[in-house]
């Protein structure tokens, strides 16, 4: 099966997702503690987009997930964040190697003091159709 490009692309995605899991304590340290998870937006039902944060102990290294479950890309999707620290894009399902469009995106996003999703800070991100973006802060 891996000789077919779509299967290879899915394997690439899972390989990198597993790598992200292994190197980020936010994905396993507080699995059984409510402090390890925070909804950012679970109510965007009309656009079928949700976002959440996985926290590490002491909230030193956190991961923000933004997931789009529709075939509609959102060019300047504003996502709320609980920090003004810069957010680094560490995994993007829209990369060519995962079967995405391969459209280039910035690596660093700097939140501004603009309330969104019940958070004091936010930034705009070009969220791809059926896309998942993971940011580290």
List where the protein language model places each region.
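Carbohydrate-interacting/catalytic domains
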Residues: 1-137
């Amino acid at each position: 099966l891996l000789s077919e490009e779509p299967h290879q692309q899915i394997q690439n995605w899972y390989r990198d997702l597993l790598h992200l899991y292994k190197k980020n304590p936010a994905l396993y340290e507080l699995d059984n503690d409510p402090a390890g998870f925070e909804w950012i937006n679970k109510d965007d039902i009309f656009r079928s987009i949700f976002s959440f944060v996985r926290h590490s102990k002491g909230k030193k290294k956190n991961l923000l997930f933004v997931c789009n479950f529709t075939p509609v890309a959102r060019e300047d999707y504003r996502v709320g964040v609980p920090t003004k620290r810069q957010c680094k894009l560490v995994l993007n399902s829209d990369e060519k190697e995962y079967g995405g469009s391969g459209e280039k995106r910035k690596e660093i996003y700097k939140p501004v003091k603009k309330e969104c999703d019940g958070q004091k800070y936010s930034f705009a991100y070009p969220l791809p159709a059926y896309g998942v973006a993971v940011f580290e802060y």
